[in-house]
Amino acid sequence: STSRRQRQMCIRDSMAIVQRFAVLNRATMAAIIIKGMGFTEVNRFETIHNYIDFSRMILRKGAVSAELGEKLLIPINMRDGSLICVGKGNPDWNYSAPHGAGRLMSRSKAKELLSMEEYQESMNGIYTTSVSRATIDEAPQAYKSMEEIKNAITDTVEIVDTIKPIYNFKASD
């Protein structure tokens, strides 16, 4: 019979393989988009959320690594963009930062309470074909504000820039 230790090693190895596959998958998608759009890549960094950090044995659910000097991205919403940050390596935060702004309301509450008119108006100035009833749960109004997040993360990251979208795509299931 398989020992407990062998099962744990199998799970760990499987998770490591899946996480490596995800890294390669993101790199492949980026390469296809860059080539298809005729862009030149200037800089790249990767921020992963919802994974196991085997080096520190930290399960990051809704969180990303924020090791000392590590560049990371914290998405806010589809209108306001994302924060580019550098980690402070704060052990009180498990060397982590939030993966995003966090919801003000559940997906079902957003579908119930938010209006299409308000959603459409909030996306003025950003090219998108994704604003619809099917994506209203992702409306900017469903998330905490950028200011609230900026104020909450000072112990774990230094904010170095804010990037604002000019194009947004959100698949509707």
Model-assigned labels for residue ranges:
Residues 1-11:
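Single conserved hydrophobic/aromatic residue that forms the stacking wall/gate
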Residues 8, 42-60, 139-145, 164-173:
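A glycine-rich phosphate-binding loop feature that marks nucleotide/adenosyl-phosphate handling sites
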Residues 12-88:
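Accessory "access/gating" subregions that flank catalytic or transport cores
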Residues 15-23, 109, 135-139:
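Hydrophobic alpha-helical scaffolding
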Residues 20, 24, 28, 92, ...:
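Conserved active-site and cofactor/substrate-binding residues in soluble primary-metabolism enzymes
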Residues 53-55, 81-83, 92-93, 104-106, ...:
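Flexible loop/turn segments at secondary-structure boundaries
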Residues 90-93, 97-126:
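Catalytic phosphate/nucleotide-handling subdomain of diverse soluble enzymes
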Residues 123-173:
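Long, Lys/Arg- and hydrophobic-enriched amphipathic alpha-helices
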